[in-house]
């Protein structure tokens, strides 16, 4: 697990990539098929970022502490250098986090999903990295194809062109900003709440 409490400041040494997606096996009710989202994360996303040493990769289930998760998730959606949202199965949390990211950051957001004829209307004009339905096993050749495409999307995102529909259609909106010091204070507050809850439960 990724422990934010041990970080003096999260965003100082390496670029951060936050992954918004479901984890484990989930049902895709659009086609009544079960999808193992951990396969695409481990074999494609994590595998690719193992070679992108300038980035630190974080997925929500790798964050320890319930209060820390809440604060750090919103902080990451604002401050992360890159967010990858895999919306396969139309996972509610991933869709919600993608919407927050689009509201907070004009650029550096990548959407990916398994191929489907049913793309949400509000996203059908966004650039989306799609990959084939791989069933229960993602073979190495197909994994390499997806990794190559994802790497291209990452390189393009570093140009910081606007990819948020909100900032595309309402260009006068100014994105919010938070300093590293303020972020550390929020994380410290969350840590204190976590310890207080633990003490109360333990009594």
Spans of features found by a protein language model:
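Conserved N-terminal substructure of TIR/SEFIR domains
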Residues: 2-63, 75-80
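Serine-centered coil/turn micro-motif
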Residues: 28-29, 120, 164-165
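Short N-terminal amphipathic alpha-helices
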Residues: 55-59, 87, 98
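Short, acidic/glycine-rich phosphate-metal binding loop used to engage nucleotide
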Residues: 62-66, 88-90
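Short acidic active-site motifs
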Residues: 68-72
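Cross-kingdom TIR/SEFIR domain
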Residues: 74, 89-154
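C-terminal interaction surface of TIR/SEFIR-family domains
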Residues: 127-203
